[in-house]
A protein has these predicted regions:
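Membrane-interface coil-to-helix junctions
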Residues: 18-114, 142
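Membrane-embedded helix bundles of polyisoprenyl
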Residues: 108-124, 130-144
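Hydrophobic alpha-helical transmembrane segments
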Residues: 11-15, 87, 105, 133-137
Length: 144
């Protein structure tokens, strides 16, 4: 028997997570070129760390971000700019548009993975698909 790539449960969780992410951020803020929602507070720090890192040359260690800081160099880790995504997207910096941001994508991934793993854990404990789907909705809507 051929194994399915995606089950309907994963599709339901994906669509629900995406819908909640649109509700949470707004459709316009889910655009990768919209930085207007990243100009205040900690979000501005995340975006600035990413911009300095994106515009700098490749250095070793990979997360080194010497232009971000006043007198001493820093690392992408200390600006909370999600180093895994920062290093990944820096590889493609010549193909990205100038005002690129990946934080809305990161928020969606966090919500979806929280839903998916909560479904898998609850299903492992109960073996009940409807109960697992409904329970995982609570994990989607309680963003921690």
């Amino acid at each position: 028997m051929k194994k399915k790539i995606f089950s309907y449960q994963q599709i339901v969780l994906f669509v629900t997570s995406l819908s909640f992410c649109f509700y949470l951020l707004g459709y316009e803020n889910f655009n990768f070129s919209n930085q207007s929602w990243l100009i205040n507070g900690d979000l501005a720090q995340y975006q600035l760390g990413w911009k300095f890192y994106q515009e700098d040359i490749w250095r070793f260690p990979l997360g080194l971000n010497p232009n971000y800081g006043i007198t001493n160099s820093s690392s992408i880790i200390y600006s909370d700019s999600i180093p895994l995504l920062a290093i990944f997207f820096k590889i493609f910096k010549n193909f990205l548009f100038e005002d690129f941001q990946y934080f809305s994508f990161w928020i969606f991934i966090c919500i979806y993975l929280q839903a998916l793993f909560s479904f898998k854990i609850i299903y492992y404990l109960t073996k009940n698909i409807p109960y697992s789907l409904i329970s995982s909705l609570f994990f989607i809507f309680s963003t921690i």
